[in-house]
């Protein structure tokens, strides 16, 4: 498999007054096409900063970030936004669903805004796989947290992105709903070959991935392939 994500000597610095604080310090990282990789580490170790830089939501300070062969560091804002919309799907701890739209609308709007228009076949495949067929007419306020997160996942993958970046996707969920969401991410990886990078502090969540990478103080300290 070819790598779909590559970072080379990646640095991310934040400014605290006149002081530069490194969140990422020379990170070298690869994700192969079709992998499900979990990034673990204590709070403040840089794992969310890594995900935001990989997704083009934050600018690298130094180094290179290649996503599907495109170096985000050498792109302008418009190019980076275009790549993000067409090649990357995001799943966050907060569901960020539009409260006035039902589940169908929250998913379909991604096809209209970021895709080539509504694709009924793709929509049906994804919503069926995520167990949302009987929830499509429900608004977010009428759904459980787990159901809302499944809608958010459907919205993220409905346009067939090259990679899903998930930042603590089960952080607001109870144990039962966490297991459902993680099982569905694993299913998407195994059945559709969806590449996923997931940030988590939970070893039980990381166990659903193919490989676990550990971070500390802005660097990757190891990466353990799953048995």
Label the model's feature ranges.
Residues 3-215:
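ABC family nucleotide-binding domain
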Residues 212-224:
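H-loop (His-switch) and adjacent beta-strand-loop-beta switch element
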